[in-house]
Amino acid sequence: YKKNIIIEKPICLKTSQVTELYKLAKKNKVKVFPVFQNRYNKAIQFLKKKKTIDALGKLRIISVQVRWCRPQRYYDLADWRGTFSHDGGALTNQGIHHLDAMRYLCGELKTVNAKMSTLGAKIEVEDSVVANFELKNGALGTLEVTTSARPKDYNATISLVGSKGLAQIGGLALNELQIYSPNQNLCKMNSEKIPTAYGFGHFSFYRDIKKYFSNSTKFPVSFDDCLKTINLLNSFYISDEIKNSVNPTKIKDSKRLGT
């Protein structure tokens, strides 16, 4: 159809698919707009500022937690749900927001060691993953994502421990700055009350698209940026597949995702 396209999370399941997508877009002279709406949240944008993040000192520990509920009836709503070919598991479908936000705030990872399991539903994909990782800057991290929590969604947080302080983002959609030890008074003004898990990020997302077409303002998510998030996603699956640590920059695509 040769139309500009907006693609919700995740833009693709494989890095090879991302590359092919952007090649086709370039060939047909159209634009791809991947959606990472939580990047626009006040709390995320606050911690993205150099002055704000520097006040925490050198990053030492990063923790990502998602404890949500997706019962069997959720997967039974459509045949594609809970499949590796069209959906991916808890990390791909739910945890992708937090994985991307962590990478957006903290930078690239050096190693990933992940273990996945299906604990709360009869599906072929994982509904739970735990992992440890190391950033290129030497900081250590843990990731815990599950949709096997019952009977409801509980917490979803990202915390950053630095040499001078601690910051934590949480809420329904990473919309609350819960802790900022350098100045706790800044938390309320950098938090948002949201009616649903979708938050308000899509409004800012569409404004950026409008700016792109109105005055050629550069869209904030580039091909390379998007590719790195999908590459990181695949590294967790590959680590689970080979039962060993992997370097995200030296791996290809998961054998399960998108196949």
Q: Which residue stretches match the model-derived regions?
A:
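A general structural signal for well-ordered alpha-helical segments in protein cores
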Residues: 18, 43-44, 98-99, 202-207, ...
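Beta-strand-loop-alpha-helix segment that lines the small-molecule cofactor/substrate pocket
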Residues: 1-39
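NAD(P)-dinucleotide binding in Rossmann-like oxidoreductases
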Residues: 119-126, 136-204, 222
